[in-house]
UniProtKB/Swiss-Prot annotation:
Top-level taxonomy: Eukaryota, Metazoa, Ecdysozoa, Nematoda, Chromadorea
InterPro entries, per database record: APOBEC/CMP_deaminase_Zn-bd, CMP_dCMP_dom, Cytidine_deaminase-like, dCMP_deaminase-rel, Deoxycytidylate_deaminase_dom
Organism, scientific name: Caenorhabditis elegans
Protein name: Probable deoxycytidylate deaminase
Coiled-coil ranges from the UniProt annotation: none
CMP/dCMP-type deaminase domain mapped to chain residues: 49-183
Length: 197
């Protein structure tokens, strides 16, 4: 059984992102609390436990999104298994949720025109100079635009939870395959999403 996320991990991940200073402070705390025991994450299941742990953090991060339909979280980890960035889908800084709605019906107010995706936010808010050789953990397989950014950032691999059979995701797979950027879906048991408060 995968151990539940502790209240400390939840608070560290869910209460941040008010501004970039808050993000950097929280990432520093995450690095200490989450990554100090990174070596313990590898067990008889190989790296599976480590991947599940970072995907759980991505899942908790997704709870920060105000999107009523699709909450996505992303965690980027360096070669030492230290978190260098997190992101979730939402409107750009300074864009009011009350003015810009999460609508998909009206073409001019369609949320897809305005929302910054979790992967994009994580890339923009990184705490390092480069993402070269970093690993990405995301709750939803990256769309074609996010795949472009991940390829350009030269990340090493993408792990994801959920996949969709839609044009943007098929195009993404085609690009990732051609760029030889590996991706892998991790199936997690339901109890892996339990959060202890």
């Amino acid at each position: 059984m995968v151990p539940p996320i502790t209240s400390d991990e939840f608070c560290e991940t869910s209460g941040c992102f008010g501004d970039s200073a808050n993000l950097h402070t929280t990432l520093e705390r995450l690095k200490i609390n989450i990554n100090s025991d990174a070596k313990k994450l590898v067990d008889t299941n190989g790296d599976l436990k480590k991947h599940q742990r970072f995907l759980r953090i991505a899942k908790v991060t997704s709870l920060r999104s105000k999107d009523p339909n699709t909450q996505v979280g992303c965690v980027i980890v360096d070669k030492d298994n230290c978190i260098v960035s997190v992101g979730y889908n939402g409107f750009p800084i300074g864009v009011d949720d009350d003015v810009f709605r999460w609508d998909k019906e009206d073409p001019e107010d369609n949320k897809h025109l305005y929302v910054v995706h979790a992967e994009m936010n994580a890339i923009i808010n990184k705490r390092c100079t480069t993402l070269h050789d970093c690993t990405v953990y995301v709750t939803l397989f990256p769309c074609n635009k996010c795949a472009q950014m991940l390829i350009q950032s030269r990340v090493k691999k993408v792990y994801f939870l959920e996949n969709r059979d839609e044009l943007a995701f098929r195009a993404s797979k085609k690009m990732l395959d051609h760029a030889r950027l590996p991706y892998e879906q991790i199936v997690m048991p339901q109890e892996a999403y339990v959060i202890e408060l």
